[in-house]
Amino acid sequence: MNSVTISHAPYTITYHDDWEPVMSQLVEFYNEVASWLLRDETSPIPDKFFIQLKQPLRNKRVCVCGIDPYPKDGTGVPFESPNFTKKSIKEIASSISRLTGVIDYKGYNLNIIDGVIPWNYYLSCKLGETKSHAIYWDKISKLLLQHITKHVSVLYCLGKTDFSNIRAKLESPVTTIVGYHPAARDHQFEKDRSFEIINVLLELDNKTPINWAQGFIY
């Protein structure tokens, strides 16, 4: 692990070597906007903003990307809910349960699955207000997701409205699926078969499919 010092909280970013090519730009962009976004109480807390940068990228095949953290109780790990109360991760777990037949589980975490990096496009929001920090993170968000897509085969974005123009923001060619948000109305996410489709796409690319059942916590 490497670390770099920044002028504002969290003051230090610890990161895996795979993120090195974007770190100097990240530090520059963050120092420009940090004083604005830190005026708010945030979800997650600043110490958790950059926690996913500890993840290597070279062993990842899929990025599962949400728009921003939970408006309360964000952990810095996208979709993570230690007490398994958040609708998004419960819906994701139900979808994987239908796909895999696993039913007796107490939780689900995308961050423990081989080959998968869960990501949030914006790394924080004002406590209780989703997408409230979009304007501050925009340059950083584009920089970091762009970097991730250089390593993965499939980018799966959850939210048809939020990610409607995501392909235009990315320069590297990556297979992109834009699916329904897990909290979408009318049970649209239930009918979405993206997790299956991702594995078909990986096989077509001669990559190992994802074992989605690995995310279950018992």
Swiss-Prot record:
Keywords (A to Z) from UniProt: DNA damage, DNA repair, DNA-binding, Hydrolase
Catalyzed reactions: Hydrolyzes single-stranded DNA or mismatched double-stranded DNA and polynucleotides, releasing free uracil
Keyword field contains DNA damage: yes
Keyword DNA damage among UniProt keywords: yes
EC class of the enzyme, as a word: hydrolase
Enzyme Commission number: 3.2.2.27
A GO biological process held by the record: DNA repair
InterPro entries, per database record: Ura-DNA_Glyclase_AS, Uracil-DNA_glycosylase-like_sf
PROSITE patterns given in the database record: U_DNA_GLYCOSYLASE (PS00130)
GO molecular function annotation: DNA binding; hydrolase activity, hydrolyzing N-glycosyl compounds
Role, per record: Plays an essential role in viral replication as a component of the DNA polymerase processivity factor. Excises uracil residues from the DNA which can arise as a result of misincorporation of dUMP residues by DNA polymerase or due to deamination of cytosine.
Family the entry assigns: Belongs to the uracil-DNA glycosylase (UDG) superfamily. UNG family.
Subunit structure as annotated in this protein's UniProt entry: Homodimer. Interacts with protein OPG148. Component of the Uracil-DNA glycosylase(UDG)-OPG148-polymerase complex; OPG148 and UDG form a heterodimeric processivity factor that associates with OPG71 to form the processive polymerase holoenzyme.
Protein name per Swiss-Prot or TrEMBL: Uracil-DNA glycosylase
Organism, as annotated: Monkeypox virus
Gene transcribed to yield this protein: OPG116
